[in-house]
């Protein structure tokens, strides 16, 4: 697996199509998310938060196919937590230059998730983030716990499209998490190189 950081403006048309198609496959087709996709974007998933303020982490396999993605947005710019899920926070959604939102995080294979997660945190921290916020479902919350990710809940669990979700906040610095080392099954040299 090879990981790269991209800005929307720097992506060529082919890469944009690949990412939009991958997100649609993962979120709409696989997970069944009901998203407002315009007719001219059928088969592709984008939203109003895909702007020049977003940074994208993309994971590729040896055939240059996308197998994972994540989106980072500073909370000083429009973001999903503030614009759609503010009711998931007990108080006002975080809004600070050092707090970034991570959304549209997904991988084709489960074993790719934590390498991409750590790489996303590293990208955010190098860009000036101290903390990451986002929405997770109960499955992802359990996955974070299993993998030693320390986080705090920003509010109570709420129902959204027949799913339990909650807003969380976590450190953008890998050393603050108990699972800072990859599980032994995932410690190939290639993965360690990408996530160091």
Swiss-Prot record:
EC code(s) of this entry: 2.3.1.184
Entry GO MF terms: N-acyl homoserine lactone synthase activity
Top enzyme class: transferase
Cross-referenced InterPro entries: Acyl_CoA_acyltransferase (IPR016181), Autoind_synth_CS (IPR018311), Autoind_synthase (IPR001690)
Domain of life: Bacteria
Record field: catalytic activity: a fatty acyl-[ACP] + S-adenosyl-L-methionine = an N-acyl-L-homoserine lactone + S-methyl-5'-thioadenosine + holo-[ACP] + H(+)
GO annotation terms (biological process): antibiotic biosynthetic process; quorum sensing; signal transduction
Key words of the record: Antibiotic biosynthesis, Autoinducer synthesis, Quorum sensing, S-adenosyl-L-methionine, Transferase
Pfam families noted in UniProt: Autoind_synth (PF00765)
Annotated Gene3D superfamilies: 3.40.630.30
PANTHER family noted in UniProt: ACYL-HOMOSERINE-LACTONE SYNTHASE (PTHR39322), ISOVALERYL-HOMOSERINE LACTONE SYNTHASE (PTHR39322:SF1)
Family (UniProt): Belongs to the autoinducer synthase family.
Stated role: Required for the synthesis of a yet unknown N-aceyl-homoserine lactone (N-aceyl-HSL), an autoinducer molecule which binds to PhzR and thus regulates phenazine production.
Name recorded for this polypeptide: Acyl-homoserine-lactone synthase
Native species: Pseudomonas fluorescens
Lineage: Bacteria, Pseudomonadati, Pseudomonadota, Gammaproteobacteria, Pseudomonadales
Gene this protein is translated from: phzI
């Amino acid at each position: 697996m090879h990981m790269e950081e991209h800005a929307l403006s720097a992506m060529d048309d082919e890469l944009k199509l690949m990412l939009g198609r991958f997100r649609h496959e993962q979120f709409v087709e696989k997970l069944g998310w009901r998203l407002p996709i315009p007719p001219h974007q059928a088969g592709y998933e984008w939203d109003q938060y895909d702007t020049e303020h977003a940074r994208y982490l993309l994971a590729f396999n040896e055939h240059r196919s996308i197998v994972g993605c994540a989106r980072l947005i500073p909370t000083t710019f429009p973001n999903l937590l503030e614009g759609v899920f503010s009711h998931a926070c007990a108080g006002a959604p975080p809004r600070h230059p050092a707090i970034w939102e991570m959304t549209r995080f997904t991988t084709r294979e489960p074993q790719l998730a934590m390498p991409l997660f750590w790489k996303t945190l590293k990208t955010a921290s190098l860009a000036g983030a101290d903390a990451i916020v986002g929405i997770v479902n109960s499955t992802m919350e359990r996955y974070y716990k299993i993998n030693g990710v320390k986080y705090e809940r920003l509010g109570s669990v709420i129902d959204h499209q027949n799913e339990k979700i909650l807003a969380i906040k976590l450190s953008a610095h890998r050393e603050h998490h108990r699972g800072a080392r990859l599980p032994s099954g995932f410690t190939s040299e290639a993965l360690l190189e990408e996530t160091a």
